[in-house]
Swiss-Prot record:
Signal peptide positions (record): none
Complexes and interactors: Part of the 50S ribosomal subunit.
GO molecular function annotations of the record: rRNA binding; structural constituent of ribosome
Chain's role: One of two assembly initiator proteins, it binds directly to the 5'-end of the 23S rRNA, where it nucleates assembly of the 50S subunit. One of the proteins that surrounds the polypeptide exit tunnel on the outside of the subunit.
Name this protein carries in UniProt: Large ribosomal subunit protein uL24
Gene3D superfamilies linked: 2.30.30.30
Residue ranges of the TM segments: none
GO biological process: translation
Gene of this entry: rplX
PANTHER family the record matches: MITOCHONDRIAL RIBOSOMAL PROTEIN L24
Sorted UniProt keywords: Ribonucleoprotein, Ribosomal protein, RNA-binding, rRNA-binding
């Protein structure tokens, strides 16, 4: 199945602790149906000291399930994603709310 949410997309969290927060997807894990969104679902992790890194407690992003996030449309509201095949045979993602193409 084609990916509805991809790296670089601006998304909004639909439910959970971070509901309503927006961020950019910087990693997608299709096998787990999860994505990492910058600044969303932050957790504290204990980092052991190494030669290159200092030890201590660091904050990092935890994966969010794809069903809990939606792409932000041009109007700033969450939208579902559909697909459209153009005349030249290329498949593009389309915002269901507005009908606008998401990627060119």
């Amino acid at each position: 199945m084609a990916a509805k949410i991809r790296k670089g997309d601006k998304v909004i969290v639909l439910s959970g602790r971070d509901k309503g927060r927006t961020g950019e997807v910087f990693e997608v894990r299709p096998a787990e149906s999860r994505a990492l969104v910058r600044g969303v679902n932050m957790v504290k992790r204990h980092q052991k000291q190494s030669q290159s890194q200092e030890g201590g407690i660091i904050s990092k992003e935890s994966p969010v399930h794809l069903s809990k996030i939606a792409i932000v449309g041009k109007d700033g509201k969450p939208t579902r994603v559909g697909f459209k095949i153009q005349a030249d045979g290329t498949k593009v993602r389309v915002a269901k709310r507005s009908g606008a193409e998401i990627d060119g």
